[in-house]
Regions:
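N-terminal interaction modules that seed assembly of large macromolecular complexes
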Residues: 2-60
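Internal, Lys/Arg-enriched amphipathic helical interaction segments that engage polyanionic partners
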Residues: 58, 65-166
Length: 166
């Protein structure tokens, strides 16, 4: 079963059984982190360039626990005429991490489109001024995906134990 399907099923099954604030993480992972989530993150991580792939209308949200596993390692660069990645040395592009705010379903789609999902290089963000892109190895997406799967299993184990006691 795909992690996105599992997240959706868990959300549907637990919506009336546990407090809504405990389900926010599931929703963020399923649909992606919102603009107001990203603003809260930038308050905690000044200087990190954020990849804003999904933005929606602001709503009241629970305080954000910074999901460190969603920071992807990479490099700012350009692909040269021979197809090689060339690093860009611009002071404002010194970050080597960006926050991946897209939902798990989008991550699944990205990985499905890659011929070799553990060896590919992909671009996450673009800087218009320099023409540079932020490149990551696809293994970074796999790492996020696996972490969410593991965290979901831990969450389910905990909730099942709590519901048995109640």
């Amino acid at each position: 079963m795909k992690v996105s399907d599992a997240l959706l099923l868990v959300l549907r099954c637990l919506r009336q059984r546990i407090p809504e604030d405990r389900l926010i993480w599931l929703n963020r992972e399923l649909l992606g982190y919102r603009q107001d989530d990203l603003e809260a993150l930038s308050d905690h991580h000044m200087g990190l360039n954020m990849f804003l792939a999904w933005i929606s209308e602001p709503r009241r949200r629970a305080p954000l626990e910074v999901p460190g596993y969603r920071f992807l390692e990479g490099v700012w660069g350009r692909i040269d005429r021979s197809g090689r990645l060339v690093s860009v040395m611009e002071p404002e592009l010194a970050q080597r991490q960006i926050f991946c705010n897209i939902g798990i379903q989008q991550i699944e789609l990205q990985l499905d489109e890659m011929e070799h999902p553990t060896e590919a290089l992909f671009s996450l963000s673009f800087d218009e001024r320099t023409g540079a892109e932020f490149f990551c190895e696809s293994a970074e997406l796999v790492r996020v995906y696996d972490h969410v799967r593991s965290k979901l299993i831990d969450f389910l184990d905990k909730v099942i134990a709590e519901l048995r006691v109640a």
